[in-house]
Amino acid sequence: MEEKISNLGVCFFSGRMLYSVAEKGAKNIVQQLGSYEFSFDISEALNKPTSDAGIQLKAVFTDLEKEFHLECIRLLTEPTQECWTALPKVVYDDSIEREQHIAILMKGVPRENIEVTWHAVSKTRFKFLCLRRAQLIKNYQSFSDQVAINECCSDFEIGGMWSIHHRPGGSFLLIGCHARSISISSYILGRFRAATYIRFDDPQDISYLWLQHAEHSPWMRGLHEHVYFYGEQTHEVAKQLQSFIDHNSGQIVLNSLEIMGINAEEETYGFDLATAFPAIMLSLDLS
């Protein structure tokens, strides 16, 4: 019997690695969902693959590669490791001006050390720019020796996958809750509209910081039919933001397979499924 070819989706939340394995071509079925809890600092492992922590993390990927015939590994990158901004398309179209903006945004970082990706948005006169340090991507890719296709995806890209998978229609916000940041992505009629992220030291500051960011990003105050939350401490974040989100919006925490529209052999898990949501989306074939 021919071995099934699968995709692996991975994300990290506060000392835990969440993973999802789905058969190639699967739209709403996962083969396996799981998590690993580590005693070491995951950020150290990701930033220093040759450290003891990095070697232990790589061993986990090696075990998964042995267990499944993987064709593709997709990993979620943490928002604070990236720079996001929207720029007029005329900047994108002019190579000189484009490079000047990148140099300003990543001041002091040599151009060869910057990974640049441009994304289409609902307003065609703009482009959305995501910048990362190239070394970060090399670090992520170093955890797999066997799989040729190895992609790193941003929080705002998860919204596009959710839109294809769930087809919520209308408009929605997707809020990713991390230990020291939240990401906010807006979609309208299935198309990416805008995104930003908010850093914080104390979760109690989220509501104040939201108001501060909304002054410069008015789309955050716009009408959205649904607001989805995923990640860690989702209920706490939702509570902090309930006064600032349109009361007519349906607020949904993506913490069950039923809500996500996903089928799996197991129904209960020993971890919060809201933290596994990105890994699930990354494992599906949603192109």
Positions of predicted regions on the chain:
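Glycine-rich phosphate-binding loops at beta-strand->alpha-helix junctions
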Residues: 225-250
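A short acidic (Asp/Glu
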Residues: 84-90, 185, 236-242
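Glycine-rich phosphate-binding/hydrolytic loop that grips phosphoryl groups
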Residues: 255-287
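Active-site neighborhood for divalent-cation/phosphate handling
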Residues: 62, 72-164, 258-262
